[in-house]
Amino acid sequence: MNVRAILQKTDEMPWVPASSLFGEKLLVDGKDVVFLKILSDRRQEGGGVAEMTRFSPPPGKRIRIKAVAESDEHVYLLKGGHEDGTGEPLRFPGDYLLHPKGLPHSAILSQETIALVIYAGEPDRIMEFRVENADR
């Protein structure tokens, strides 16, 4: 068995459009608003995926996403945050979330948000993704 560390210099890695992995449902008027840096993908070895995710809603808009955790999902917010349906902030940089396998969950993002996301296995199944006016 060949075991070795994986090192990524994240500042040197490009942001990849999430639509290239999850499909056109993540496009808004043909433009990407979600980007990824895949830090590791060990699913072939029975592991999971570690990534940095960047949500970039257009000015005056917010992203609303609903998903189901296909494996335990660990989320650590680095920048930005989530809000509730009225625009009140709910999650902040430094917050940690665990979505256990099978848990339906959602997020509303009206500002650029970057998170470290670690899946124990498969990534989330996205049930709904839309961009809407940020009017409260």
Which residues make up each language-model segment?
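Conserved short histidine dyad/triad with adjacent acidic residue
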Residues: 32-69, 83, 88-90, 100-104
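Alpha/beta-hydrolase fold active-site loops
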Residues: 72
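Ligand-binding loop in jelly-roll beta-barrel domains
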Residues: 101-128
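A short, N-terminal "cap"/entry segment at the start of jelly-roll beta-barrel domains
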Residues: 1-49, 132-136
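Conserved strand-to-loop "acid loop" that flanks and positions the catalytic carboxylate
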Residues: 80
